[in-house]
UniProtKB/Swiss-Prot annotation:
The lineage of its organism: Bacteria, Pseudomonadati, Pseudomonadota, Gammaproteobacteria, Pasteurellales. Keywords: NADP, Oxidoreductase, Porphyrin biosynthesis. GO terms for biological process: protoporphyrinogen IX biosynthetic process from glutamate. Pathway: Porphyrin-containing compound metabolism; protoporphyrin-IX biosynthesis; 5-aminolevulinate from L-glutamyl-tRNA(Glu): step 1/2. This is Glutamyl-tRNA reductase. Disulfide bonds: none annotated. It comes from Actinobacillus pleuropneumoniae serotype 3 (strain JL03).
């Protein structure tokens, strides 16, 4: 039995190549069907994000020994299929792809789900993406009146509980390490209740979208967006499914006069909010506390605005200091998280070994039972036909003993022939022959 992780990520491949191997819904469905048709795996889970594409295969028929020719051939078949479905040259792909098996594959999956392998250390979104990937796989196999193999399913369930444990036992996700989240975290330190505050966001790009999502998530209800192109701001509001007041840049003063918190991130080469504009706004607001966070480079907000009474002003440089401090905390937490992953990975493989021994014992008992029933049936026929009962029973016991000992005897002879003294000793110890 082998679990194989095959993939590429932001560490091994460019954005261009990562985009070529991404799985949309249609290609994911095709992949499931092809893998099943070609018998590449008993089950597979496909994880596809902007930073990684990884497939987790479980094949019960493949030996776990990586150097074995069957294992090597299977890996190559998986690789060739992966190149084929994405219509890529082998050479282009081979330089960027990685294979991890069994213990390393399980550890890698757990590290991925915990955010330890992410571009932004500890980012929480990846766990949801791993769960969604598992759900896609589960849905496919259910549609085929089947299910994900027990061992692969157990690995993913263990992974989810490991990620939950990492979040609860470490500080890996407690501090912001992106500019957008750091800005919002700073706002939460200064103001308590976002639901009662008025926000002015200047710009409508990716950073402002992240800021808006964070604010909404933490209860913000009153948001204005000012942008050079109002239509882009309207599109952002629609995408966030949240009513927002849209302003043009020429109406910035109107927004400032109402805002408790201003967060700005545009690509403008010119300053958009002067100290004088903030001063006018403060008079309108009766000098209630105002927070200005300027994420833009070059600046959108006059750096001297912070000299005004009740105005708190922060720049992107201030946020970078916060991020560096938080990143150091996350790196320390990541060491704790890695220890948890190792513990959980070992625990999973202990379960797997127990499961494999249980399966082996079950098959051995089934074979023995089949032999018993076959010989018993022959003995009953002989007794019914009037043969001597003592002779029939002796023959039954003799044949049963020979049948049950035939395979173990062959194994002993093979070990003796190959000079496997350790195997012979273990066999003798298991059968308690040394004590006799």
């Amino acid at each position: 039995m082998t679990i194989l992780a095959l993939g590429i990520n932001h560490k091994t491949a460019s954005v261009n190549l990562r985009s070529k191997v991404a799985f949309d819904d249609q290609k994911r469905q095709l992949a499931f069907e092809q893998i099943q048709h070609r018998a590449l795996a008993e089950s597979v889970v496909i994880l596809s994000t902007c930073n990684r594409t990884e497939l987790y295969f479980h094949n019960a028929e493949i030996t776990p020994r990586e150097e074995h020719e069957d294992n090597i051939a299977w890996r190559e078949q998986c690789f060739e299929w992966f190149a084929e479905i994405h219509q890529l040259e082998h050479n282009e792909l081979r330089e960027c792809i990685y294979f991890k098996q069994n213990m390393e594959a399980a550890r890698h999956l757990m590290r991925v789900a915990c955010g330890l392998d992410s571009l932004i250390l500890g980012e929480p979104q990846i766990l949801g993406q791993v769960k969604q990937a598992y759900q896609y796989s589960e849905n496919f196999y259910q549609s085929q009146n089947s299910h994900i193999s027990t061992k692969l399913s157990r690995l993913f369930q263990r992974t989810f509980s490991t990620a939950k444990r990492v979040r609860s036992e470490t500080e890996i996700g407690s501090s912001a390490v992106s500019v957008a989240y750091a800005a919002c975290g700073l706002a939460r330190q200064i103001f308590d209740n976002f639901g009662k505050l008025r926000f002015l966001l200047v710009g409508a790009g990716e950073t402002i979208e992240l800021v808006a999502r964070y604010l909404i998530q933490h209860g913000a209800k009153n948001i204005m967006i000012a942008n050079r192109t109002p239509q882009r701001a309207e599109t952002l509001a629609e995408r966030l499914n949240t009513p927002m007041q849209i302003l043009s840049l020429s109406a910035l003063q109107i927004g400032l006069n109402q805002a408790d918190i201003v967060i700005s991130s545009t690509g403008s080469p010119d300053m958009l909010i002067s100290k004088e504009m903030v001063e006018i706004a403060q008079k309108q607001r009766q000098f209630d506390p105002m927070l200005l966070i300027d994420i833009a480079v070059p600046r959108d907000i006059d750096e001297n605005a912070g000299e005004l009474d009740a105005v708190y002003s922060y720049s992107v440089d201030d946020l970078q200091h916060i991020i560096q401090r938080n990143m150091a905390q996350r790196e320390q937490a990541a060491e704790q998280a890695a220890q948890i992953v190792d513990e959980e990975c070992k625990a999973f493989f202990e379960w797997l070994k127990q499961q494999q021994s249980s399966d082996l014992i079950k098959r051995y008992r089934q074979d023995a039972e089949q032999t018993r029933q076959e010989l018993l049936a022959k003995a009953l026929v002989a007794l019914t036909s009037g043969q001597d009962s003592e002779k029939v029973l002796n023959e039954l016991s003799y044949k049963l003993t020979n049948s049950l000992l035939h395979v173990p005897t062959q194994a002993l002879q093979a070990m003796a022939k190959s000079g496997n003294s350790q195997g012979l000793q273990s066999f003798s110890k298991a059968l308690k022959l040394e004590e006799q």
